[in-house]
């Protein structure tokens, strides 16, 4: 039996979280076209007769000196050193640039085994030629490269085979029925944040976070009171929407997803609260991301 920890890294919006969800067969990490939707290191667990793979989804790799981004990058670096194998995800639509150079430099310096995954091969307009040239120039062997579509489930089984080939014999670190080790309150919080980002598209991705104020398991259903926190007064109105339609829509969709994942009905009460300039508070950012 084989087992091991595998980090998933790459630039923002390359499909890392979609890949994690696709492999594990569950919605573990929230997905969005909005860059850097993932903030924490999210573990997804895949177990079959061959063994167990513990995936660590990471924030999108982005070079920036802002406090928020530095905290995100610290999560990426710590995930790399915790793993036996790195999956480096490249979006087939992206022209290789400075961040690709930096990511490969970090991987190669780490001396940790890695696989390069070129994602979204179902898309017609691509930079595949440029990507392959870039990887060739970096002396990446072809047997380390696999092309997939996480969304369309293309070559996912082949990718699992490739991962197992690169893992050592080891125990099951988690019971075989586990597909994540996330605590319930974090999962619920992330679901609400994911739905909010989806509804607002690109208006507020970095300016919100969610917190669970009350979480009680009451016989046949969960009772949840949660807050969506914004950094500026004007953002409250964007989330609440005209006549409260925005927050109502967020609540309804979040409730459906939470009930499905937890396999139990839930009463969800949402509020929008202002914590002015929270996204500039280094201590709070550290607590949120770690």
Curated annotation (Swiss-Prot):
Residues 200-276 form the KH type-2 domain. Residues 36-40 are annotated as: G2. InterPro entries: AAA+_ATPase, G_ERA_dom, GTP-bd, GTPase_Era-like, KH_dom-like_a/b, KH_dom_type_2, KH_sf_prok-type, P-loop_NTPase. GO terms for biological process: ribosomal small subunit assembly. It is found in: Cytoplasm; Cell inner membrane. Gene3D superfamilies: 3.30.300.20, P-loop containing nucleotide triphosphate hydrolases. One of its GO terms (molecular function) is ribosomal small subunit binding. The keyword Chloroplast does not apply. GTP binds at residues 10-17, 57-61, 119-122. Residues 119-122 are annotated as: G4. Residues 148-150 are annotated as: G5. The keyword Membrane applies. Residues 10-17 are annotated as: G1. Residues 57-60 are annotated as: G3. SMART domains: AAA. Residues 2-169 form the Era-type G domain. Keywords: Cell inner membrane, Cell membrane, Cytoplasm, GTP-binding, Membrane, Nucleotide-binding, Ribosome biogenesis, RNA-binding, rRNA-binding. One of its GO terms (cellular component) is plasma membrane. It holds the Pfam family MMR_HSR1. Belongs to the TRAFAC class TrmE-Era-EngA-EngB-Septin-like GTPase superfamily. Era GTPase family. NCBIfam families: era, PRK00089.1, small_GTP. An essential GTPase that binds both GDP and GTP, with rapid nucleotide exchange. Plays a role in 16S rRNA processing and 30S ribosomal subunit biogenesis and possibly also in cell cycle regulation and energy metabolism. Monomer. This is GTPase Era. The lineage of its organism: Bacteria, Pseudomonadati, Spirochaetota, Spirochaetia, Spirochaetales.
